[in-house]
């Protein structure tokens, strides 16, 4: 019931929802460049050799309050397991699509070339989820990658989405192992698998 109430607030009044939800408050702060990191532009390539722009961040700029929020999020998602701590060096898109390692050196603003060039094909998993596939959560109808979250499915699973094991990097926060739909972006979003 509380989740439905928050979803309704988010749909009708984004500002009220941001004020109601610490997670989205921090994301809004990050989007408004109040959490900043110096970066240089570089490129990585999809399996079909399309050039993708990435940022090589020269400083891991994690304010103390971000670490406090990370602890708060872990309380909201108790079934998640932290793999590594907060880092503004890499993000969920880079982790899921380019290099699945905690020491990944790239922040990828937009992953859509990975499926746009045919390197990964959208599929409907039905009741079978393949290991090493990816899911992209899109909040609302936005085509802006700032509102997307990429997840790497780690273990093959037959059944409902409830127990599909995935990993993802949560913005500038930690890298987590979690069930596919047990992440902050899964609420009130649509998702596709590749």
Annotate each language-model stretch with its function.
Residues 1-18:
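Mature extracellular/secreted ectodomains of secretory-pathway proteins
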Residues 13, 19-31, 194:
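A recurrent domain-boundary module in secreted/ectodomain proteins
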